[in-house]
Amino acid sequence: MLNNIKTIFTSKLFYILVALIFIVPFLYEKLPIRIDITQQSSLPQKIWLTYSDLAVESEYILFIPPKTKYTLDSNIEYLKKISCNEDDLLVVDENRDYFCNDKYIGTASKYDGNKNLIENFVFSGIIPKNKYFVTGTHPLSHDSKYFGFIDKSQILRKAKPFF
């Protein structure tokens, strides 16, 4: 039995497998195009093609949200739809309804999933340069209606629905 364990630990194959276990995830993060799976319920699609080239035309982005009292874990990546771009007119009314260039894009809930009152992001005006307003399709989607604009520097990858 001990000889079998020694044989395993002295095998080149063992060290190659260990190296692959540690190297593959690192390399996967760096791929220019990859498949990502989201567990969030804020968008109907679950499987996405993501691109490291931020010049790729896409209306979806993978990003790290700004740190607020509603985003406690700063390592969680969000995938949302860009609903309003820089230089667009964003308006929120007294009913917590959001409009981009006069087109309705969503309503902020008064309560979170635990029935606690939740503050919404209030802004009316032209979206500043390099800022984006992102949303999900779920009524309780945790998005820009609560944490505000996403800065271009927070974008990790562009995304397109795979299915």
Give the residues covered by each predicted segment.
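Short charge-dense sequence patches
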Residues: T7-Y15, K103-D112
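Short small/polar-residue motifs
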Residues: R34, N85-L90, F121-V122
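Acidic/glycine-rich C-terminal interaction modules and beta/coil loop segments
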Residues: S52, A108-A159
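Surface loops and adjacent helix of pleckstrin homology
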Residues: P66, E94-N95, N101-K103, S109-K110, ...
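Mid-length scaffold segments of soluble, non-membrane domains
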Residues: D73-Y104
